Amino acid sequence: DWDAVSNMYAEDCVGIDPDGTKYEGRAANLENDQKWGSMMSDFNFNNANTVESGNTTVVEMEVTATMTGEMPMPDGSSIPPSGKTHTFKACMIIDWNNGQIKKQRIYADFMSFMAGFGIMPS
């Protein structure tokens, strides 16, 4: 439910993807989430460890997905879907304000991500 996802973000939130791309504002973060949703199907998040302190939550997770859609590239080109399923590890750090995401940073090993989905040699 994209409305529910949108409402998780504060209007002025900042999101940073593993490649360092910064998304500013609710609409930009929702658009990024939708991009990932169209690129990968069968997302399954296994939260291995969650730690909270004050207004910050850190989530260590394993993510399994199948690459069924194109991966858009910064230059406007795209990588075709591989159809491969892969499990990778990621870490998300979330700062909250009034129950909404104020800042979100996601870290993952993109080299193993790209190799696992068959985008580059392993």
Report residues per predicted region:
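C-terminal and inter-domain tail/linker signature
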Residues: 1-122
